[in-house]
Amino acid sequence: MWRKRHNLPTNPRYKMTALSSSASSSSTPLLDQPMYAFGVLADIQYAPIPDGHSYSGNPRYYQHAKEAARHAALHFQEEEVQCVINLGDIVDGKCADVEKWGGTIDEEKKSEGYSGSGSSSVGHEAIDDVLEALSSYKAGRLLHTYGNHELYNLSRLELGHKLSIPFIREPNNDELVGYYDHILHEPQRQCDSDGDTWKLRFVVLDSYDICLLDRCADTSLKRKAAHEILSKHNPNYPEQENSPEGLIGLSRRFVAFNGGVDTPQLEWLENSMKSARENGEKVIICSHQPIHPQSSFTTCLIWNYDDVLQIVRKYSDVVLASFSGHAHKGGYVRDEESGVHFRTFEAMLESPRPVRTYAFVDVWKDRLVVRGMGDCYSDTYDLDHLENKVGAVSEI
């Protein structure tokens, strides 16, 4: 089952290739295996409620999503991928009021204080249920980003405990932020006989660093910044804070279900890129919200996407690609200026039974191969932009 084909890049400086993923990696000779392989999940959004629709009318399969995640985990384990990237929204915001959406809460649990919020809640239990579904994957680490839907159910502190996101408090700031990196030091598979390999660094961004969600209305400077951004750019705010009605083009990103990246995180990102360059590593950037304005619907972009994009372009000699979720239909663009690939992955939530939507990514020295399952589009992304930067790094 395939969605409409992604737009292919048109920049003549780079090769244009697209391959289907019908060939199994198990048939590939040992010396012709990718250096790294990992799994990708996006927008599971499980909730213990009947199937429904988004606010714009798209069908959503809340309970099937959990079973699709279970199948994906078994498949990831079978192929022994080195890690799995969850691009956020592991549960749906409707967990906060399941009875409104046709779900039920056991009367005994109600009497014990079980509700739509708090430490004893549907949201907490729903995340536990999805983590149990993913528990069959044991070959490597499960790297989580978080999105708006997690914050409709849990605090950042609770998410840190549940998802092992290493939230920190920035200097001179008591507010939690959840950006981090993870390095695969050794290739899982030998790619060729010359032994020329590199370490792979995953840089996981917190795109809800500046936002309204789970930030104290009285004391949070980040919430204050979010309030000022939305007040300036969206006349629907605050009465209809999630509405882009009347907004045009890129301005449609200024809604409350999005967020931004604060200065300390931008500085951290720059330092992480410098470190990768100095150590001869290559980088894949992961975030819930998309970074490039042509890689998804504009209503899903990071508020200050341009600040992040500027850093990515500066270090395009090390950045292979940027992967995100949030925009459920998916999308893709190759940045004309840098050659970096920006891919938004299709949501698991919107695939009906028996379709299970997720992806494998195989990392070769000269290309990334996305092997899409279900409604996830497959493609091959050439890494010839790395070749074009050879000898020019010292000028940056």
Task: Label every model-predicted segment.
Residues 2-123:
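N-terminal active-site segment of His-dependent metallophosphoesterases
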Residues 11-14, 28-30, 56-59, 95-277, ...:
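Extended active-site neighborhood of metal-dependent phosphoesterases/phosphodiesterases
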Residues 38-40, 84-86, 144, 285, ...:
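Residue-level marker for buried hydrophobic side chains located in beta-strands
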Residues 48, 93-95, 99, 292-295, ...:
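Short, solvent-exposed loop/turn segments at secondary-structure junctions
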